[in-house]
Design a protein with these regions (language model features):
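Ribonuclease/tRNase effector modules and their secretory precursors
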Residues: 1-99
Length: 99
């Protein structure tokens, strides 16, 4: 998906693995498998104008991955599951079944 170098905090990655059962390695794997559903600006542009949000399917569930880009580097900030984005996955899967 990207030719950028992808970086993240080791401590944050460990915290996400312990608290949410998902890691930045899962994000990279999903990106390699074309699991990126969307790439949007952060919804709060006043406060986080520099951030973007990847919507990624990880193990069948949609997650938001907040990140920033600095030159050729993509720095992953956090991951959280998204019920709203999950509905998009379900709708997409329903459309595929119908076709």
């Amino acid at each position: 998906m990207t030719s950028k170098t992808i970086l993240w905090s080791i401590e944050k990655n460990q915290q996400l693995l312990e608290t949410r059962g998902v890691s930045f390695e899962d994000v990279v794997s999903a990106m390699e498998r074309n699991g990126v559903l969307d790439d949007i600006p952060h919804p709060n542009q006043l406060r986080y104008a520099h951030q973007r949000v990847l919507i990624i399917e990880i193990e069948g569930y949609a997650c938001h991955v907040l990140y920033v880009v600095d030159g050729d580097t993509m720095f992953l900030k956090t991951i959280f599951p998204s019920r709203k984005a999950q509905r998009l996955i379900l709708r997409r899967n329903d459309d595929e079944v119908e076709n």
